[in-house]
Structures are given as structure tokens and as C-alpha cells.
Amino acid sequence: MKKVTNAIGTWFLGILLLVGLFLSIWIVLPAPIFSLLPLSVGAPEISPGLIIFNVSIPILYWVILSRGDYHQPKLLFIGLCLSGLAIILSAAPLIQFSSAQQQAQRSIVASLGEDYLKLPSSLTDKMRSQPLIISDLWGGIPSPKVRIDRDILFANPDGVPLTLNIYRPAQVGNYPAIVSIYGGAWQRGNPDSDDTFNRYIAAQGYVVWAISYRHAPTYHFPIQIEDVRQALTYIQNHAADTETNLDRVAIIGRSAGAQLAMLAAYQDPPFPIRALVNYYGPVNLTAGYDDVPTPDPIESRATLRAFLGGTPQTVPELYRQASPINAVKSALPASLLIYGGKDHIVESKYGSYLAQQLRSAGNQTVFIEIPWADHAFDAVFSGMSNQLALYYTERFLAWALVK
């Protein structure tokens, strides 16, 4: 009976080993199709937990074998090899973390200066104390209470209601502002999409305006940027009664929202924009169409056709106008660009090239690449990648808006 129990336990551990290996593979393997993207995005973010899981399997195997009642040398050898592979894969992000953080630190110091962190202690006390806090991977990142006003109508073009959310610190005051633009391939999303980040950053002393825009494929560019500009005009007209300091404003966007944020910040906004934060945003839409990544989980060409209403051959001027790289000039807002090295939706090479062009034009630019991160890595808000990104995002915003 004991031998049967040990055999069952061994096979059960084998199943767990394969589960751990399957999840760990997605740390390095990009998603070939959209439905597998959650695995490719999520696995690196929970990799410290996978390390613990994968290490426990050979330990439990050893416990069973130490009883001496069940011997399968070949099975043991295969199991140990697979366990070793799973452990190596799951440890990869943690091994790379220190190097990635050091590179990020060098980039921000090179652009903003050694004294960029000379900020009031009342502000720094609210920030992340470290680029990675292991306990927060499981316990979550704390977010103090803030005041939230949702579903405020700011425009109604063609009978389509466009709304925004306003996030404000708990105490009444006059605060710098952050305009937040969600992503979603220009086809989906709403002002609640980045709710966790918006609440978190508002608690540090900002008024966050989470805006919306009309979606493709029903509406093609430039409708989306027109809606964003209309939202900025609304913010300008309602700053006084929403505790918003219009002299200190930044724009942040993710993916498609970052493309719109860059255009809004770089092309004559209705009021001065001090800073731009771009999370994995498309930079050159013509190049993105002509040189699609492999694999291509969102079918990039179909996505761009839905957004722009054609191809670079049929609507070349729209592709040019929609590409932030063509808006680069001198005297632009300081820019923080954050991309994932594993991203096969918006490859990090485009962010790197944008950073080079911005710097060449004399603009303060911070480029951070997170080697193991996929597109939308911050969907796992307390994950490894977002902890690193958040650490520098909050410091960059404080430098730009408060210092």
C-alpha cells in the first residue's frame, strides 16, 4: 500500500512539474496568438513565485525516494532535468533585475541629473522605497484612499458620449495634474482601465484626469486625437474648480494611449505640458505596418488598417500624421519611455529609436527597457516589471511636476 501511495505521489508531482515548466516557458516565449498573451505577460511577473513552486518539486521527489520503497531511476533523472530547466527559466527575470535597474538608474541620472531626487520628504515618503519589494508581489501594492468622480461627460460628438474620471488626493488642495490615456489597440478601453494606477498616483498629490476617445474601427484617425484635444480643452476650462494646477501637467499613456499621448504632448497642446510618460507606445506606424514582429499576436496590420482606414500605400499621410516620431522637434516636454524587451506588439527598438531622436533634438529623455517584460506588463500591477516601472515613473513625475 505504501508503495502504491508513493507511486501516486510521484506521478502527481510529475504533473505539477509539467505545470511549473509550462508556465515558466512563457517567461521567455512570446505569445504566438492573442489568446495566449496573458501567459506571456503574466508569467514573468509572478516568476519569484514560480521559483518557489519549481524548487519544491525536486525536494518533494527526494522525500518520496528517501523512503526507499519506490525506485524509478530514469523517471527521476528526467524529472530532475525538467525541474532544473523550470528553475532556470523562472529565475531569469530575478537574475536580470539588478542589471535592468542599474541601466534604468543610469538613464534617468544622465537625463535629469544627479540631483533629480532632491524632493520634499513629504512626497518621497509616499513613494516606493525600493525598485522591487518581494512581499508586494503577493500582498499587493498599497493604495491610500482618494476622491474619485466618475463618468463626467466632457463631449458628445456625433451622439457618442465621451466621459472622464477625476482622481484627487483625500485632502482638498491645489495639485499638479496628470492626464491618463488608456490603451487597447484604439478599439477598446474606458477611463476605468487604469484605475489602480490612477488611484495610486493620485494619492501622491496629483489630480488625475482619465479621459476617453472614440474607438476604431467605427472611427478612424484623426478622430481619436481630436477627442483627446477636446478633453484637454475641457480640463483647461475646469481646472479652477477641480483643484488642478494647469502650470504643472503631465500626460501618461499606455500602448495605443501612449501614441495619442505623444501626439497630444508634442503637437501644440492647449496649455503647456511639462512631461510625457510613454508605456510601450507605437512610434512609427508605417514601419510597424511594413515590419511586423514575429510572432504577431494582435495581427498588427489588421489593427493599423482598422485604426487608420487603410494601408501606408493607400493613406500614407494619415500614417505619417499618426506617427509620433514625425512630431519630434526641439523644446518638447521631458519624456519617460518604458518598453518591454520581450514585447512583440510594440517592439522596444522603436522606443529606443524615439529616445535617440528626442535626445538629438535636445530634449530630456529617459529610456528604460525591461528585458523580460511583455506588452502591457503593468496589467499585473504588483508584478516585477511594474514595480520597477512604477519606481521610476513616480520619481520622474515628481521631478517634472513638483520639484
What is each residue range found by the language model?
Residues 26-30, 230-293:
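Primarily recognizes the serine-hydrolase "nucleophile elbow" in alpha/beta-hydrolase
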